[in-house]
From Swiss-Prot:
It comes from Ralstonia pickettii (strain 12J). NCBIfam families: aden_deam (TIGR01430), PRK09358.1-6 (NF006850). This is Adenine deaminase. Binds 1 zinc ion per subunit. The lineage of its organism: Bacteria, Pseudomonadati, Pseudomonadota, Betaproteobacteria, Burkholderiales. Keywords: Hydrolase, Metal-binding, Nucleotide metabolism, Zinc.
Amino acid sequence: MPISSALAERIATSPKAELHIHIEGSLEPELMFALAERNGVKLPYASVEEVRAAYAFDDLQSFLDLYYAGASVLLTEQDFYDMTAAYVARALADNVHHAEIFFDPQTHTARNVPMHVVIHGIVRALDDAEREHGFSSALILCFLRHLSEEDAFDTLEAALPYIQDPANRIIGVGLDSSERGNPPEKFARVFARCKELGLRLVAHAGEEGPAQYVIDALDILKVERIDHGVRAIDDAALVKRLAAERIALTVCPLSNEKLKVYPDLRDHSLKQLLDAGCAVTLHSDDPAYFGGYMNTNWLATFNALDLSAADAHALARNSFEASFLPEQDKALWLAKVDDHWKAAH
């Protein structure tokens, strides 16, 4: 049953933090085409409509193939700036006030785009967003799990000068790309090194991979937050642990539906995980490819799972609690979230 228009409006206007957003996954077809033209890159599509048609993929690998083709248009600092500024505009429209944004340097350095071009373009847009709109943000450098751990170490080494300068906003590392056949332990040493460096640790686990990958990400990689994690529902002991330790799951329902993790949103495990006391949060993942930014994800999920105002309040609170914001900033946002929701349930 669709939720009430009053609840839909309160969800849309609620303060939120976005903790699972790949900046390259926010590249809309129109901007992809504009950048291809600007840079003289030939795309395998004749029109924006053809790109949209290619978005009819139904598994992670087909999506990744398209994602990497799209990234080929990103060549200059201005390209990364434009892509990031476009994401921020959409986030602000959805009342996202803080974002912890993934970026994939290996996708770009493999194409001979220098690390500084990627980082400076993204950071310049985030600096402008903070100055002009008060938009708070941080960056999480992701290693591509289909590549080797040695490649991840090389990437970390190349990124270190940027990581060590707080102006670049890089607070942590993550692990993304093809989960099947690339278990967390493949990256145990590089994550141990990142922990030594004082970086925050997160990893994609339990999306297409099994619940065991969530356990391994926690126990081998020592991550603080699990990206996706929806397959945890298959292991009752793990669900209890996630709830007891308040380990956040950054869940992306439209992504899960599009990639057939859950072919029908009505079957999604989000509500079960939330009811079990897990620190579930709700995000957009790769919104240009999966059909929606934050509010679209929230509203689709609430309609499919018949969630309540109390659920919305919990999800909004969880998004700030699970963030890597300083405690005093978290407290300010949690008070704003509580004010927003106190009259609704």
